[in-house]
From Swiss-Prot:
Protein name stated in the entry: Leucine-rich repeat-containing G-protein coupled receptor 6
Family recorded in the similarity comment: Belongs to the G-protein coupled receptor 1 family.
Native source species: Homo sapiens (Human)
Entry's Gene Ontology molecular function annotations: heparin binding; protein-hormone receptor activity; Roundabout binding; transmembrane signaling receptor activity
InterPro entries: GPCR_Rhodpsn, Gphrmn_rcpt_fam, Leu-rich_rpt, Leu-rich_rpt_typical-subtyp, LRR_dom_sf, LRRNT
Principal location listed in the UniProt entry: membrane
Length: 967
């Protein structure tokens, strides 16, 4: 019987002869290469390629040329194949039937296809292997049966396919390895059984596949492997066990002596035993990431001379660096998220070709000398516990280009540590504890990261880094040398937006290969490198330095305008001097004991003094650093002076608001208490309230010292975050604003209630109208000035509209402390108590002084609604004459409290009951009576006399701290 090539030749001759008319000349026309009507054909010599795909065919064209070598019927609507349909296509080498609706193929469907080498039946609905049909294909080399519904492969399915080299059975419903069926494929070189439901691989499953080179078993449910599962695979080079449920390391791979690429990532393997790859000396790549590996034998990776990539992530129990003896070709080593504490001193001797060393997220504390790893190009040591860099740690690494030491605890770096790194272009020292940075050897840097080193206030000139393009420093002041003025720098957030836009553009242009996950290489080109390339292409590349200076990070002046500077100094002088005068007159010249409201007003003056002192400290810093603030800005922000300034500012402002709230509530409560109980709250309770307010204000001021908020966020040392601050930094600011806003609401409610209660009774016995009016003025002024602060704070938090840093800075420097100087001015200019207290502080020139001053002072006081009558001048003269004619013996050493003069009236004049002047019915605030010049009632505020009086010719006889007299 002739061989297949012989048969092919015979059939070719027969086809050529049949194509001519018997005994005649060739006829004009399409000839033997006529193409079926719906298909597209292409000639290849005397052979024909017919493309009938995606035409919606429901049957195979019947007029196919016998010389067709390629036939594509994929993506049609074929549901069945008739026996003998392709019998005349003796020269057909490739037949594509994928993407149809074939559920069954009869036994004689492929009869006559002796030359067929490639048969594609994927993406159909086959429920089994068309074994009888395949027996007719002795030359078949590639068979695709993937993406069908095959659940069982009979023993004789591939019988007769002795030439088959490639077999696809993936994406089916197989539950076991078709061991017996595979025994008939001795020439098979590549097979995939992926995406099935296989749960176990028995021993000797592939023992007859001695020619197999590639085996894919990924995306199954494999939990166990037999010890001899891969026995007989003497030529296997690639084994894929990824995405399974393996519980143990596949020790069966030790029989694969020619294995070069091994993948078993995304399994449940927890340990890699000692000498795990002892039988695989030709291994080049191992992928086993995304496994819960907790233990790795120290000798697991020994004697793998061909291995060039090793990636091991998340093995938390690994505390010692693996012994890589004999693994001399390793180029990329990744051991992250493990527990490695120490690197062996001989590591570089074992790995002379190492180019990339990634040891991030470990517990390394000390580094050995890496000078023997002279081919190193990238080192990643971020997120470790390294505290020192020695002189020889990175010496002689002339090829090193990128060094990442971020998120460590590095305190010191030897001055010569980087001196030999001539190729270094990227250095990352973010979030360490550096105080200085040695510059030797860093002249070629293009990207330098130093953020998070709060103790590093060192200035970096342009001459230190002539090639620098991207600089990230702890403080914006260190960016000042890279711009001539504040306008040079971009507005806050502009660079960030451009970076994001650039990232979006480049990600769409970047090849897909760079976006795919590469377990062996985490150093794909990133945005920083892209920016470096773009900057190099510019004729005059500039340095992108962050964070950028601005109004809250000035380069030259803390106060950038003379208007703000003069306003701050005016606030300082007025607040300190005026509040000091208020404190002096209230506590040194006032009556004893002090009225409760007056005591609170004095406490407010003390709080305002603290605000003035804090503003004075800022003004002094501006004066001392005039024109060169960037040289001292970092030290000022991190120093004790800034924290003290912020503490005083918050303590003063919060105490002022809380004490003002207390004063308003005290006035309102006094009215209610007098009406209900006949007496007002005592001075002791008010003092307790003052202490509570001061304690609450002190707590608020101390929170930023405990890292709740921050005083050093800006050189103003206030916890109010600038507009570009992080949302987390705004939390403390918003809390303060909301608390103060609540206090002003309480104040408003208290005074509304107070004025509603005024017409309901006669409260002149406990009423000090001047102080109540003064508190009302304080509420109005302070509330009005606090509105811009609250508005800008909420606008920044909610993002209602963009707020310029200049506006925020002006409000914080001028508007926020303005009540500290306005409050005492209101007291000094409009409150009659100040003049009374000031007179008491003056030296007494004569005996009549105290009484005269008391009487004159009471004349200057006016009532809330003009119902408290003024004392007639004749009565004052009477008192003055009496004091000059005969001086009582005890009057010289007696200190009188402030005196309220109330006229006793006729008819229906008030009667004296004890120490109170009681009006008859119908005589209230709105119904005054004519006064009598000869009768006066002198009564001390807030005190009750025991008795006694002033007779016509006698002297004063005071009792206790108060006196009453009826003339």
């Amino acid at each position: 019987m002739p061989s297949p090539p012989g048969l092919r030749a015979l059939w070719l001759c027969a086809a050529l002869c049949a194509s001519r008319r018997a005994g005649g000349a060739p006829q004009p026309g399409p000839g033997p290469t006529a193409c079926p009507a719906p298909c597209h054909c292409q000639e290849d010599g005397i052979m024909l390629s017919a493309d009938c795909s995606e035409l919606g065919l429901s049957a195979v064209p019947g007029d196919l040329d016998p010389l067709t070598a390629y036939l594509d019927l994929s993506m049609n609507n074929l549901t069945e194949l008739q026996p003998g349909l392709f019998h005349h296509l003796r020269f057909l080498e490739e037949l594509r039937l994928s993407g149809n609706h074939l559920s069954h193929i009869p036994g004689q469907a492929f009869s006559g296809l002796y030359s067929l080498k490639i048969l594609m039946l994927q993406n159909n609905q086959l429920g089994g292997i068309p074994a009888e049909a395949l027996w007719e294909l002795p030359s078949l080399q590639s068979l695709r049966l993937d993406a069908n519904l095959i659940s069982l492969v009979p023993e004789r399915s591939f019988e007769g396919l002795s030439s088959l080299r490639h077999l696809w059975l993936d994406d089916n419903a197989l539950t076991e390895i078709p061991v017996r069926a595979l025994n008939n494929l001795p020439a098979l070189q590549a097979m995939t059984l992926a995406l099935n439901r296989i749960s176990h691989i028995p021993d000797y499953a592939f023992q007859n596949l001695t020619s197999l080179v590639v085996l894919h078993l990924h995306n199954n449910r494999i939990q166990h492997l037999g010890t001899h599962s891969f026995e007989g695979l003497h030529n296997l080079e690639t084994l894929d066990l990824n995405y399974n449920k393996l519980q143990e390391f596949p020790v069966a791979i030790r029989t694969l002596g020619r294995l070069q690429e091994l993948g078993f990532h995304n399994n449940n393997i927890k340990a890699i035993p000692e000498k795990a790859f002892m039988g695989n000396p030709l291994l080049q790549t191992i992928h086993f990431y995304d496994n819960p590996i907790q233990f790795v034998g120290r000798s697991a990776f020994q004697y793998l001379p061909k291995l060039h990539t090793l990636s091991l992530n998340g093995a938390m129990d690994i505390q010692e660096f693996p012994d890589l003896k004999g693994t001399t070709s390793l180029e990329i080593l990744t051991l992250t998220r493990a527990g490695i504490r120490l690197l062996p001193s001989g590591m570089c001797q074992q790995l002379p070709r190492l180019r990339v060393l990634e040891l991030s997220h470990n517990q390394i504390e000390e580094l050995p000398s890496l000078h023997r790893c002279q081919k190193l190009e990238e080192i990643g040591l971020q997120h470790n516990r390294i505290w020192e860099i020695g002189a020889d740690t990175f010496s002689q690494l002339s090829s090193l280009q990128a060094l990442d030491l971020s998120w460590n605890a590095i305190r010191s770096i030897h001055p010569e540590a980087f001196s030999t790194l001539h190729s270094l272009v990227k250095l990352d020292l973010t979030d360490n504890q550096l105080t200085t940075l040695p510059l030797a050897g860093l002249g070629g840097l293009m990207h330098l990261k130093l953020k998070g080193n709060l103790a590093l206030s060192q200035a970096f000139s342009k001459d230190s880094f002539p090639k620098l393009r991207i600089l990230e420093v702890p403080y914006a002041y260190q960016c000042c040398p890279y711009g001539m003025c504040a306008s040079f720098f971009k507005a806050s957030g502009q660079w960030e937006a451009e970076d994001l836009h650039l990232d979006d553009e480049e990600s769409s242009k970047r090849p897909l290969g760079l976006l795919a996950r590469q377990a062996e290489n985490h150093y794909d080109q990133d945005l920083d490198e892209l920016q470096l390339e773009m900057e190099d292409s510019k004729p005059h590349p500039s340095v992108q330095c962050s964070p950028t200076p601005g109004p809250f990070k000035p380069c030259e002046y803390l106060f950038e305008s003379w208007g703000i500077r003069l306003a701050v100094w005016a606030i300082v002088l007025l607040s300190v001097l005026c509040n000091g005068l208020v404190l002096l007159t209230v506590f040194a010249g006032g009556p004893v004991p002090l009225p409760p409201v007056k005591f609170v007003v004095g406490a407010i003056a003390g709080a305002n003094t603290l605000t003035g002192i804090s503003c004075g400290l800022l003004a002094s810093v501006d004066a001392l650093t005039f024109g060169q603030f960037s040289e001292y800005g970092a030290r000022w922000e991190t120093g004790l002076g800034c924290r003290a300034t912020g503490f005083l500012a918050v303590l003063g402002s919060e105490a002022s608001v809380l004490l003002l709230t207390l004063a308003a509530v005290q006035c309102s409560v006094s009215v209610s208490c007098v009406r209900a109980y006949g007496k007002s709250p005592s001075l002791g309770s008010v003092r307790a309230g003052v202490l509570g307010c001061l304690a609450l204000a002190g707590l608020a001021a101390a929170l930023p010292l405990a890292s709740v908020g921050e005083y050093g966020a800006s050189p103003l040392c206030l916890p109010y975050a600038p507009p570009e601050g992080q949302p987390a930094a705004l939390g403390f600011t918003v809390a303060l604003v909301m608390m103060n806003s609540f206090c002003f609401l309480v104040v408003a409610g208290a005074y509304i209630k107070l004025y509603c209660d005024l017409p309901r009774g006669d409260f002149e016995a406990v009423w000090d109208c001047a102080m109540v009016r003064h508190v009302a003025w304080l509420i109005f002024a302070d509330g009005l000035l606090y509105c811009p602060v609250a508005f800008l704070s909420f606008a920044s938090m909610l993002g209602l509209f963009p707020v310029t840093p200049e506006a925020v800075k002006s409000v914080l420097l001028v508007v926020l402390p303005l009540p500290a100087c306005l409050n005492p001015l209101l007291y000094l200019l409009f409150n009659p108590h100040f003049r009374d207290d000031l007179r008491r502080l003056r030296p007494r020139a004569g005996d009549s002084g105290p009484l005269a001053y008391a009487a004159a002072g009471e004349l200057e006081k006016s009532s809330c609604d003009s119902t408290q009558a003024l004392v007639a001048f004749s009565d004052v003269d009477l008192i003055l004459e009496a004091s000059e004619a005969g001086r009582p013996p005890g009057l010289e050493t007696y200190g009188f409290p402030s005196v309220t003069l109330i006229s006793c009236q006729q008819p229906g004049a008030p009667r004296l009951e004890g120490s109170h002047c009681v009006e008859p019915e119908g005589n209230h605030f709105g119904n005054p009576q004519p006064s009598m010049d000869g009768e006066l009632l002198l009564r001390a505020e807030g005190s009750t006399p025991a008795g006694g009086g002033l007779s016509g010719g006698g002297g004063f006889q005071p009792s206790g701290l108060a006196f009453a007299s009826h003339v």
